[in-house]
Amino acid sequence: MTRLEGRVALVTGAGRYRGIGRAIVLRLAEEGADVVVTARARDASSFPPHEQEMGWKGIESVAEEVRGMGRRALAVDCDVTDKDDLQRTVDAAVAELGGIDILVNNAALPSEAGAAPILEMTDENWYETVDVNLHGLYHTIRAVGREMVKGGGGSIINISSTAGRIGIPNYGAYCATKWAMHGLTQQLALELARQNIRVNIVCPGSTDTDMMDGTFGRYDEVAGQEPGTSKAAIRRALLMGRQATVEEQAAVVAFLASDDSSYMTGQALNVDGGSRMD
């Protein structure tokens, strides 16, 4: 398929091998887009063992995969909480790839970061989560959105979570930022529709990623359970009997990026195997 031929996408939080961000980048490239691959730089020693063993280089490895598909790719170390970093990234995308037609806001602190009851979590954990997941979203949309207005339109896809639909005990900071994403998305849809910019959300349910494995590990640790207990229990409880794959999440993002969703804006699509039907 080449329904994104001639378009340029910018995807944040795309440096993990077993991550939704990388899967999104590869699907968009498969459908014809050139891609700006961004993430906050990580020291290789912090990579999961399987990434270290394979010589994974984060966003540069993802960009190499895109180039191997015959598409252009630009890898940019970008901290979404830093407005200067974001502007530098946008400027590089315009200079080297000609503009930005698609923005996928995938960068986020994982749900287990600072997991604690609201009355017990530290201020530092609260502010850090809000800074990355909400302020980072705000800054990224402003930097890229202004360029989209100049270019005559575009599609913005925000990656939320089922945690943006329901509260989850001990994950108040994460849930609050994802709920806020929904409000901001609807507001932007109202404000940008006449500029031919659509703004939508994908809400992944439990997905087989390193980030999700970290959440399960945190559950097991807090509960004093054997590693893997929570993951097995969730899989048994899911309606389809399994977690989503990253490719299944990426397919919905590609749909929202394309003209196949040209009359959709302000919407939130659950990709959770039927866990929530609203």
Residue locations for each model-derived region?
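Active-site helix of classical SDR
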Residues: 141, 177, 185
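Substrate-binding pocket helix/loop in short-chain dehydrogenase/reductase
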Residues: 114-118, 122-130, 234
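Canonical Rossmann dinucleotide-binding motif of NAD(H)/NADP(H)-dependent dehydrogenases/reductases
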Residues: 3-42
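Short, small/polar-rich loop/turn modules that mediate ligand/substrate recognition or access, typified
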Residues: 193, 198, 264-266
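The beta1-alpha1 cofactor-binding region of Rossmann-like NAD(H)/NADP(H)-dependent oxidoreductases
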Residues: 56-57, 77-89, 123, 246-248
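Short C-terminal tail/terminal secondary-structure segment
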Residues: 115, 166, 236-242, 253-254, ...
